[in-house]
């Protein structure tokens, strides 16, 4: 086993470990998280080889990169001594890369030193590298990572408190955030999900090539785009046909996939009420990833009559001799629906359609009431794997991730029980008072 240094970002800390664990599980890697510290951007792990490190981190969003660990110290002198104390120093560290082209890089966390970098690099002369320096396309990149204690919240430190050194093995997929930035997307809306957490959600849901991912509340397709990025074939539906159709041939969900060169990953989107799902029963859905409507922009609705008695008989109405509901311009009636009921339907559908081990991941809003317990929906055949919270001012949204364990699992269930305190939409507009 070899030691590797993982360098992570200090954002969305509630999601970071879930992403790392999910990616490790996706590639069948055994990672010891006993030394993981959510408050630190550094995590030293043991892996069998570089390939395992590459597999683990190549699609991660909440890390920066992973490095073959060579040593650490509170000062540069301590670092050099620690490197030379490594049991594999001569055989694996010095000789293996003796003739490789290389370059040095510096990374700084919460500060920056005014030290002369060239002089610092010269202190590593004992490594005995004889290969040429190549700043553009080196075979190896050796990285000095300096950790600082900031002077204040807005002022970084000047002297590093800890220095790490390692060989770059794999940089993360964090650059995908720039590619999928909403500002550059042809088709987006007020409810479009941000690129970073869309991609993180897809990682935790274990969206992968050779599978089908379904978003039953697709909207403008943010999660479909994230699923396509990770190689899944994606299909979506939404009760609002306007969202599905977009604003023309050049401004719709399909146009987004065309812009990213991923049209081959896009199966289709359908105007459909999820609670009256029309997808055939034998369609294999490997992953369900979605952001159900909270009822903030508008109330949650499904197909049906708000007042069934008043609607009675109108279902057979004809226009020009044709059943009204068969016409292309037909707009079906809709009725209000509770968020709790919608989530119950989502869990039940997932238990029926996902394969054993398949994941359901969705976002759920909650109010930040200190004296009220948040009750998440549960299903007897689904294991709640992660409950990741993103907090705002007076409310939060949670990424809930479930694994389908099948009919023999017999977990807890709260189907049909009112879990939400009052109506989330009403409370939102009343400032949660």
From Swiss-Prot:
EC number: 2.1.1.214
Outcome recorded upon mutating residue 215 to A: Abolishes activity
Function: Catalytic subunit of an S-adenosyl-L-methionine-dependent tRNA methyltransferase complex that mediates the methylation of the guanosine nucleotide at position 10 (m2G10) in tRNAs.
Misc remark: Present with 2020 molecules/cell in log phase SD medium.
Any Pfam family hit: UPF0020
Subunit structure, as described in the record: Interacts with TRM112.
PANTHER family, per the entry: RNA METHYLASE-RELATED, TRNA (GUANINE(10)-N2)-METHYLTRANSFERASE HOMOLOG
Protein's name in the database: tRNA (guanine(10)-N(2))-methyltransferase
Catalytic activity: guanosine(10) in tRNA + S-adenosyl-L-methionine = N(2)-methylguanosine(10) in tRNA + S-adenosyl-L-homocysteine + H(+)
Compartment list: Cytoplasm
BP terms from Gene Ontology: tRNA methylation; tRNA modification
Organism, as annotated: Saccharomyces cerevisiae (strain ATCC 204508 / S288c) (Baker's yeast)
Entry GO MF terms: methyltransferase activity; tRNA (guanine(10)-N2)-methyltransferase activity; tRNA binding
Assigned keywords, A-Z: Cytoplasm, Methyltransferase, RNA-binding, S-adenosyl-L-methionine, Transferase, tRNA processing, tRNA-binding
Family as reported in the entry's similarity comment: Belongs to the class I-like SAM-binding methyltransferase superfamily. TRM11 methyltransferase family.
GO cellular component: cytoplasm; cytosol; tRNA (m2G10) methyltransferase complex
Chief location category: cytoplasm
SUPFAM superfamilies the UniProt entry points to: S-adenosyl-L-methionine-dependent methyltransferases
């Amino acid at each position: 086993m070899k030691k590797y240094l993982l360098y992570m970002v200090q954002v969305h800390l509630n999601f970071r470990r879930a992403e790392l664990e999910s990616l490790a599980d996706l590639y069948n890697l055994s990672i010891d998280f006993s030394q993981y510290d959510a408050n630190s951007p550094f995590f030293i792990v043991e892996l069998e080889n570089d390939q395992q490190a590459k597999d683990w981190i190549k699609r991660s969003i909440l890390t920066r990169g992973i490095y073959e660990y060579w040593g650490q110290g509170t000062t540069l002198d301590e670092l050099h001594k620690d490197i030379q104390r490594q049991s594999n120093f001569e055989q694996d560290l010095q000789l293996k890369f003796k003739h490789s082209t290389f370059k040095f890089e510096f990374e700084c966390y919460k500060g920056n030193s005014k030290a002369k970098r060239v002089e610092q690099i010269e202190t590593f002369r004992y490594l005995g590298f004889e290969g040429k320096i190549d700043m553009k396309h080196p075979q190896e990149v050796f990285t000095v990572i300096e950790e600082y204690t900031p002077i204040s919240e807005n002022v970084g430190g000047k002297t590093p408190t800890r220095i790490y050194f390692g060989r770059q093995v794999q940089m993360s997929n964090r650059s995908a955030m720039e590619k999928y930035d909403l500002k550059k997307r042809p088709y987006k809306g007020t409810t479009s999900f941000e690129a970073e957490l869309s991609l993180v959600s897809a990682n935790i849901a274990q969206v992968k090539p050779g599978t089908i991912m379904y978003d039953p509340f697709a909207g403008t397709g943010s999660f479909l785009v994230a699923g396509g990025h990770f190689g899944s074939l994606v299909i979506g539906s939404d009760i609002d046909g306007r969202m599905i159709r977009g604003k023309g041939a050049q401004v719709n969900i399909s146009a987004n996939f065309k812009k990213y060169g991923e049209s081959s990953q896009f199966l289709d989107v359908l105007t459909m009420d999820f609670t009256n799902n029309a997808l055939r029963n034998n369609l294999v859905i490997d992953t369900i990833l979605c952001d159900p409507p909270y009822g903030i922009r508008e109330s949650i609705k499904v197909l049906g009559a708000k007042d069934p008695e008043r609607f009675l008989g109108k279902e057979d109405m004809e226009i020009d001799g044709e059943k009204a509901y068969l016409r292309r311009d037909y707009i079906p009636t809709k009725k209000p629906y509770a968020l709790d009921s919608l989530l119950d339907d989502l869990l039940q559908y997932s238990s029926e359609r996902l394969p054993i081990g398949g994941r359901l991941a969705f976002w759920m809003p909650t109010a930040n009431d200190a004296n009220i317990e948040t009750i998440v929906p549960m299903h007897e055949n689904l294991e709640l794997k992660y409950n990741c919270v993103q907090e705002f001012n007076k409310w939060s949204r949670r990424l809930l991730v479930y694994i389908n364990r099948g009919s023999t699992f017999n977990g807890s269930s709260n189907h049909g029980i009112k879990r939400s305190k009052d109506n989330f939409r009403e409370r939102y507009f009343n400032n949660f008072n």
